[in-house]
Amino acid sequence: MSDALYESSIQSLPLLGKGKVRDNYAVGDDKLLIVTTDRLSAFDVILGEPIPAKGRVLNQMANFWFKKLAHIVPNHETDVTAESVVAPNEVEQVKGRAVVVKRLKPILVEAVVRGYLAGSGWKDYQATGKVCGIALPAGLQNAQKLPEPIFTPAAKAEMGEHDENISFDEVEARIGKELAAKMRDISIRLYKEAADYAATRGIIIADTKFEFGLDENGTLTLMDEVLTADSSRFWPADSYQVGTNPPSFDKQFVRDWLEAVRIDGKPWPKTAPAPKLPEDVVQKTADKYKEALTRLTGEALQ
C-alpha cells in the first residue's frame, strides 16, 4: 500500500482547503497547487481507505483531456511544474499527482452533461419523465442513449452534502443568461468531442461533470478535473446493453458494494462514517482506474 497518499502535507505552501479528493495550496496570489490524493468519495462521503495510485491516474487522465480539448475553451493549466513550487522533501507527495494552475473565480454550478440515461438521471426520469426539468421522450430504458446530449446542472453543495440538480432557469438566475448559455453550449461541445473520441477507444462516456471559473478578465475557463473516472461515467462499449447498468470503469464498483453491504443487518445510510472497504474491493477499484486510463488514452500510468 506504499503507493497510496490519503492526505498531503505540504508545509512549504499555505493550505487553502481540502476537498473530497483534492488538497489545494496557494502558490503566490494568482496560482494554486492542486494535489490529487488517493481518497475516494462515494455518495458524498469520503471513505477511510485510499485507492492506491488513483490520484496519479486521475491527474494523468485530466491532463490528457485538457490538452485534447484546449481548442474549445481556455483551461486552468500553466507551465509551472508542481515539483518546482514545493520543498525538496515534499517532491514525492506531488510527483505525478499534482498540478500548478491559474487561480480562478469558481462558478458555483456544476456543468453536468448526460448523453445516456443513468444514475440519478434515470431515477428522475422514472419519477417525472424529465431530467432536471428537461422533458424526454416516453418509454426510454435505463442506460439508453438520449436523442441528443442534455445539460443538467447541479448546485455545488457544501462538503458532506449532496449536490442538488437545478433547472437551467435557476442557473440563469445565479450567473446571468449570457454566461449560463455559454457554459451550457461549451459543456455540450466538450462532451460531444470527448464522447466521439472515446467511442474510437471502445468506451462510452454516459455522462460527465465539468467545472468552470472566470479568469481576471472574466473569461470562462475550464478548471478542476475533466473527464476523469471520478467526474464521469465510463462504460465499456463491448458489454453495453440497453436496460441494464453496464459495469463501469469508475466508482460504480465501490458504490454497488456499499449499496449491498449490511451493518448490523441494516443497509448503510450513506452518511459518515463509511464502512471499511475489503482489500479485494480496494484492489479491484485501483485496477479499474488504471484500465480506464490505458483504454482511453493508450498510455500506461507514468
From Swiss-Prot:
Q: Which controlled-vocabulary keywords does the entry list?
A: ATP-binding, Ligase, Nucleotide-binding, Purine biosynthesis
UniProt EC number: 6.3.2.6
Tell me what reaction this enzyme catalyses.
5-amino-1-(5-phospho-D-ribosyl)imidazole-4-carboxylate + L-aspartate + ATP = (2S)-2-[5-amino-1-(5-phospho-beta-D-ribosyl)imidazole-4-carboxamido]succinate + ADP + phosphate + 2 H(+)
| SUPFAM superfamilies xrefs | SAICAR synthase-like (SSF56104)
Q: In which pathway does it act?
A: Purine metabolism; IMP biosynthesis via de novo pathway; 5-amino-1-(5-phospho-D-ribosyl)imidazole-4-carboxamide from 5-amino-1-(5-phospho-D-ribosyl)imidazole-4-carboxylate: step 1/2
The main enzyme category here is: ligase
Q: What GO terms are given for molecular function?
A: ATP binding; phosphoribosylaminoimidazolesuccinocarboxamide synthase activity
Give GO cellular component annotations, separated by semicolons.
Answer: cytoplasm
Q: Name one GO biological process term.
A: 'de novo' IMP biosynthetic process
Q: According to the lineage, what is the superkingdom?
A: Bacteria
What Gene3D superfamilies does this protein map onto?
ATP-grasp fold, B domain, Phosphorylase Kinase, domain 1
Entry-linked PANTHER family = PHOSPHORIBOSYLAMINOIMIDAZOLE-SUCCINOCARBOXAMIDE SYNTHASE
Recorded family membership: Belongs to the SAICAR synthetase family.
Full protein name: Phosphoribosylaminoimidazole-succinocarboxamide synthase
Give the organism the record lists: Cupriavidus metallidurans (strain ATCC 43123 / DSM 2839 / NBRC 102507 / CH34)
The gene from which this protein is expressed is: purC
